[in-house]
Regions:
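Conserved Rossmann-fold SDR core element
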Residues: 80, 160, 170-186, 231-238
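Conserved glycine-rich cofactor-binding loop
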Residues: 7-8
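Catalytic loop of short-chain dehydrogenase/reductase
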Residues: 127, 132-158, 163-171, 183-184
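C-terminal substrate-recognition "lid" of short-chain dehydrogenase/reductases
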Residues: 125, 211-238, 243
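A glycine/serine/threonine-rich, flexible loop-to-helix segment
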Residues: 39-40, 178-207, 246-253
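Conserved glycine-rich Rossmann-like NAD(P)H-binding loop of the short-chain dehydrogenase/reductase
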Residues: 23-38
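Substrate-binding pocket helix/loop in short-chain dehydrogenase/reductase
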Residues: 95-96, 103-105, 199, 203
Length: 253
Protein backbone atom coordinates (compact mmCIF):
# COMPACT_ATOMS: atom_id res chain seq x y z
CA UNK A 1 0.00 0.00 0.00
CA UNK A 2 1.34 3.41 -1.02
CA UNK A 3 -0.05 6.32 1.01
CA UNK A 4 0.89 9.82 -0.12
CA UNK A 5 1.54 12.37 2.60
CA UNK A 6 1.75 9.71 5.28
CA UNK A 7 4.46 10.73 7.74
CA UNK A 8 2.02 12.37 10.16
CA UNK A 9 -1.59 12.75 11.20
CA UNK A 10 -4.21 10.98 9.07
CA UNK A 11 -1.66 9.53 6.65
CA UNK A 12 0.41 8.01 9.45
CA UNK A 13 -2.74 6.53 11.02
CA UNK A 14 -3.58 4.89 7.70
CA UNK A 15 -0.07 3.46 7.43
CA UNK A 16 -0.13 2.09 10.99
CA UNK A 17 -3.55 0.50 10.55
CA UNK A 18 -2.62 -1.03 7.20
CA UNK A 19 0.62 -2.39 8.61
CA UNK A 20 -1.22 -3.89 11.58
CA UNK A 21 -3.61 -5.53 9.11
CA UNK A 22 -0.68 -7.20 7.34
CA UNK A 23 0.05 -4.82 4.48
CA UNK A 24 3.53 -3.82 3.45
CA UNK A 25 3.47 -0.04 3.38
CA UNK A 26 5.23 2.76 1.54
CA UNK A 27 5.34 6.01 3.50
CA UNK A 28 5.50 9.00 1.16
CA UNK A 29 6.69 12.35 2.47
CA UNK A 30 8.51 15.48 1.42
CA UNK A 31 9.08 17.97 4.25
CA UNK A 32 8.39 15.50 7.09
CA UNK A 33 11.30 13.20 6.31
CA UNK A 34 12.43 12.54 9.89
CA UNK A 35 8.89 11.58 10.91
CA UNK A 36 8.61 9.25 7.90
CA UNK A 37 11.83 7.41 8.73
CA UNK A 38 10.92 7.14 12.42
CA UNK A 39 7.56 5.64 11.51
CA UNK A 40 9.16 3.16 9.11
CA UNK A 41 11.75 2.15 11.71
CA UNK A 42 9.04 1.50 14.29
CA UNK A 43 7.02 -0.63 11.87
CA UNK A 44 10.06 -2.57 10.66
CA UNK A 45 10.97 -3.42 14.24
CA UNK A 46 7.56 -5.05 14.53
CA UNK A 47 7.78 -6.82 11.17
CA UNK A 48 11.10 -6.68 9.28
CA UNK A 49 11.17 -5.33 5.72
CA UNK A 50 7.52 -4.34 5.81
CA UNK A 51 7.75 -0.54 5.59
CA UNK A 52 9.63 1.72 3.19
CA UNK A 53 9.97 5.47 2.76
CA UNK A 54 9.55 7.38 -0.49
CA UNK A 55 10.73 11.00 -0.40
CA UNK A 56 9.37 12.93 -3.35
CA UNK A 57 7.74 16.21 -4.32
CA UNK A 58 4.37 15.56 -5.97
CA UNK A 59 5.39 18.18 -8.52
CA UNK A 60 7.18 15.27 -10.25
CA UNK A 61 3.94 14.86 -12.18
CA UNK A 62 4.91 17.94 -14.20
CA UNK A 63 7.83 16.07 -15.80
CA UNK A 64 7.31 12.70 -17.48
CA UNK A 65 10.81 11.43 -16.71
CA UNK A 66 10.58 12.46 -13.05
CA UNK A 67 7.16 10.84 -12.81
CA UNK A 68 8.53 7.56 -14.13
CA UNK A 69 11.30 7.83 -11.57
CA UNK A 70 8.67 8.19 -8.85
CA UNK A 71 6.89 5.09 -10.13
CA UNK A 72 10.08 3.03 -10.10
CA UNK A 73 10.96 4.27 -6.61
CA UNK A 74 7.47 3.29 -5.44
CA UNK A 75 7.77 -0.19 -6.93
CA UNK A 76 11.33 -0.80 -5.80
CA UNK A 77 10.74 -1.84 -2.15
CA UNK A 78 8.14 -4.58 -2.71
CA UNK A 79 7.75 -5.02 -6.47
CA UNK A 80 4.05 -4.15 -6.63
CA UNK A 81 1.37 -1.79 -5.35
CA UNK A 82 -2.10 -3.12 -4.76
CA UNK A 83 -3.60 -0.12 -2.94
CA UNK A 84 -2.91 3.53 -3.77
CA UNK A 85 -4.15 6.02 -1.18
CA UNK A 86 -4.23 9.69 -2.14
CA UNK A 87 -3.91 11.44 1.21
CA UNK A 88 -1.43 14.26 0.53
CA UNK A 89 -3.16 17.63 0.58
CA UNK A 90 -2.61 21.33 0.97
CA UNK A 91 -5.18 23.43 2.83
CA UNK A 92 -5.19 27.18 3.38
CA UNK A 93 -7.55 30.10 2.71
CA UNK A 94 -7.71 31.96 -0.60
CA UNK A 95 -10.20 34.75 -0.05
CA UNK A 96 -11.24 36.76 -3.08
CA UNK A 97 -8.77 39.56 -3.62
CA UNK A 98 -5.87 37.47 -2.30
CA UNK A 99 -5.79 34.57 -4.80
CA UNK A 100 -2.43 34.20 -6.55
CA UNK A 101 -1.21 32.02 -9.40
CA UNK A 102 1.11 30.33 -6.94
CA UNK A 103 -1.72 29.39 -4.56
CA UNK A 104 -3.87 28.21 -7.46
CA UNK A 105 -1.10 26.02 -8.85
CA UNK A 106 -0.12 24.55 -5.47
CA UNK A 107 -3.65 23.74 -4.30
CA UNK A 108 -4.73 22.34 -7.65
CA UNK A 109 -1.57 20.28 -8.09
CA UNK A 110 -1.66 18.64 -4.66
CA UNK A 111 -5.41 18.16 -4.35
CA UNK A 112 -6.42 17.32 -7.93
CA UNK A 113 -3.72 17.07 -10.58
CA UNK A 114 -1.28 14.83 -8.70
CA UNK A 115 -3.92 12.24 -7.72
CA UNK A 116 -5.04 11.93 -11.34
CA UNK A 117 -1.60 11.66 -12.91
CA UNK A 118 -0.19 9.39 -10.20
CA UNK A 119 -3.19 7.10 -10.68
CA UNK A 120 -2.52 7.05 -14.41
CA UNK A 121 1.19 6.33 -13.96
CA UNK A 122 0.56 3.47 -11.51
CA UNK A 123 -2.48 2.09 -13.32
CA UNK A 124 -0.75 -0.83 -15.11
CA UNK A 125 0.55 -2.13 -11.79
CA UNK A 126 -2.81 -1.73 -10.07
CA UNK A 127 -4.56 -3.48 -12.96
CA UNK A 128 -2.12 -6.39 -12.78
CA UNK A 129 -3.25 -7.20 -9.23
CA UNK A 130 -6.87 -5.99 -9.45
CA UNK A 131 -5.97 -3.29 -6.97
CA UNK A 132 -7.78 -0.19 -5.82
CA UNK A 133 -7.44 3.56 -5.45
CA UNK A 134 -8.73 5.35 -2.35
CA UNK A 135 -8.85 9.13 -2.12
CA UNK A 136 -9.10 11.17 1.07
CA UNK A 137 -11.44 14.03 0.17
CA UNK A 138 -13.50 16.40 2.34
CA UNK A 139 -17.18 16.74 3.20
CA UNK A 140 -16.82 20.28 1.86
CA UNK A 141 -15.83 18.98 -1.60
CA UNK A 142 -19.47 18.49 -2.50
CA UNK A 143 -22.07 21.24 -2.03
CA UNK A 144 -21.01 22.65 1.34
CA UNK A 145 -17.94 24.79 0.54
CA UNK A 146 -15.80 26.57 3.11
CA UNK A 147 -16.17 30.34 2.92
CA UNK A 148 -12.88 31.94 1.86
CA UNK A 149 -11.33 28.69 0.61
CA UNK A 150 -12.55 28.78 -2.99
CA UNK A 151 -9.43 27.28 -4.62
CA UNK A 152 -9.24 24.44 -2.09
CA UNK A 153 -12.97 23.79 -2.55
CA UNK A 154 -12.57 23.66 -6.33
CA UNK A 155 -9.56 21.35 -6.15
CA UNK A 156 -11.20 18.87 -3.79
CA UNK A 157 -14.38 18.92 -5.88
CA UNK A 158 -12.30 18.04 -8.95
CA UNK A 159 -10.70 15.21 -6.98
CA UNK A 160 -14.13 13.90 -6.00
CA UNK A 161 -15.20 13.94 -9.65
CA UNK A 162 -12.01 12.04 -10.51
CA UNK A 163 -13.01 9.28 -8.08
CA UNK A 164 -16.38 8.77 -9.73
CA UNK A 165 -15.05 9.15 -13.28
CA UNK A 166 -12.23 6.64 -12.79
CA UNK A 167 -14.54 4.22 -11.01
CA UNK A 168 -16.57 3.99 -14.21
CA UNK A 169 -13.58 3.93 -16.52
CA UNK A 170 -11.44 1.41 -14.66
CA UNK A 171 -14.09 -1.11 -13.59
CA UNK A 172 -14.08 -4.05 -13.25
CA UNK A 173 -10.30 -4.29 -12.92
CA UNK A 174 -9.55 -1.44 -10.49
CA UNK A 175 -11.93 -0.08 -7.88
CA UNK A 176 -11.87 3.64 -7.03
CA UNK A 177 -13.48 5.11 -3.92
CA UNK A 178 -13.23 8.14 -1.69
CA UNK A 179 -13.48 9.04 1.97
CA UNK A 180 -14.78 12.43 3.06
CA UNK A 181 -13.55 13.36 6.54
CA UNK A 182 -15.32 15.95 8.62
CA UNK A 183 -13.40 17.36 11.56
CA UNK A 184 -10.95 14.54 12.20
CA UNK A 185 -7.87 16.62 12.93
CA UNK A 186 -7.96 20.05 14.54
CA UNK A 187 -5.68 22.83 13.24
CA UNK A 188 -2.29 23.17 14.89
CA UNK A 189 -2.88 25.38 17.95
CA UNK A 190 0.21 27.39 17.01
CA UNK A 191 -0.87 28.02 13.40
CA UNK A 192 -2.78 30.96 11.99
CA UNK A 193 -5.75 28.60 11.54
CA UNK A 194 -5.92 27.69 15.24
CA UNK A 195 -9.36 27.72 16.84
CA UNK A 196 -10.43 28.69 20.35
CA UNK A 197 -11.95 26.39 22.95
CA UNK A 198 -15.31 28.04 22.31
CA UNK A 199 -15.02 27.36 18.59
CA UNK A 200 -14.06 23.75 19.26
CA UNK A 201 -17.08 23.35 21.54
CA UNK A 202 -19.33 24.78 18.83
CA UNK A 203 -17.95 22.27 16.32
CA UNK A 204 -18.54 19.36 18.69
CA UNK A 205 -22.08 20.61 19.28
CA UNK A 206 -22.71 20.53 15.50
CA UNK A 207 -21.68 16.86 15.22
CA UNK A 208 -24.43 14.33 15.98
CA UNK A 209 -21.86 11.92 17.44
CA UNK A 210 -20.78 14.73 19.81
CA UNK A 211 -17.04 14.33 19.39
CA UNK A 212 -14.20 15.34 17.12
CA UNK A 213 -13.19 12.51 14.83
CA UNK A 214 -9.78 10.88 14.93
CA UNK A 215 -7.27 9.88 12.25
CA UNK A 216 -7.99 6.27 13.18
CA UNK A 217 -11.61 6.73 12.09
CA UNK A 218 -10.33 7.50 8.58
CA UNK A 219 -7.83 4.64 8.68
CA UNK A 220 -10.59 2.17 9.55
CA UNK A 221 -12.57 3.26 6.50
CA UNK A 222 -9.51 2.97 4.25
CA UNK A 223 -9.05 -0.64 5.34
CA UNK A 224 -12.73 -1.36 4.77
CA UNK A 225 -12.63 0.04 1.23
CA UNK A 226 -9.39 -1.77 0.47
CA UNK A 227 -11.18 -5.06 1.17
CA UNK A 228 -14.68 -4.25 -0.13
CA UNK A 229 -14.52 -5.97 -3.51
CA UNK A 230 -18.00 -4.93 -4.68
CA UNK A 231 -17.80 -1.22 -3.84
CA UNK A 232 -16.60 1.32 -6.39
CA UNK A 233 -17.42 4.94 -7.15
CA UNK A 234 -18.51 5.67 -3.59
CA UNK A 235 -17.51 8.56 -1.35
CA UNK A 236 -18.11 7.69 2.30
CA UNK A 237 -18.48 10.55 4.77
CA UNK A 238 -16.57 9.79 7.97
CA UNK A 239 -17.74 12.82 9.88
CA UNK A 240 -19.89 11.70 12.80
CA UNK A 241 -22.95 12.92 10.92
CA UNK A 242 -21.70 16.52 10.64
CA UNK A 243 -22.52 16.78 6.94
CA UNK A 244 -26.19 16.15 7.79
CA UNK A 245 -26.32 19.35 9.83
CA UNK A 246 -23.99 21.50 7.74
CA UNK A 247 -25.08 23.86 5.00
CA UNK A 248 -21.67 25.42 4.40
CA UNK A 249 -20.13 28.23 6.32
CA UNK A 250 -17.05 29.66 7.94
CA UNK A 251 -14.29 27.56 9.47
CA UNK A 252 -15.17 28.98 12.89
CA UNK A 253 -18.66 27.45 12.91
Amino acid sequence: MLVTGSAKRIGAAIVRAAHHAGYRVIIHALSSQSEAYRLADTLNQTRPDSAAVLIADLAVIEDSDALQGFVQDALSPFGQIDVLVHNASRFYPTAMGTITHSAWNELMLTNAKAPLLLSQALLPYLQAVHGCIISVLDIHADDRPFVGYSVYNMAKSAHRTMVQSLALELAPTVRVNGIAPGVNVLPDPHSDQAISNAQQAAIVNSIPMQRIGTPDDIADCVLYLARASYITGEVIAVDGGRSLTLAGGHMSV
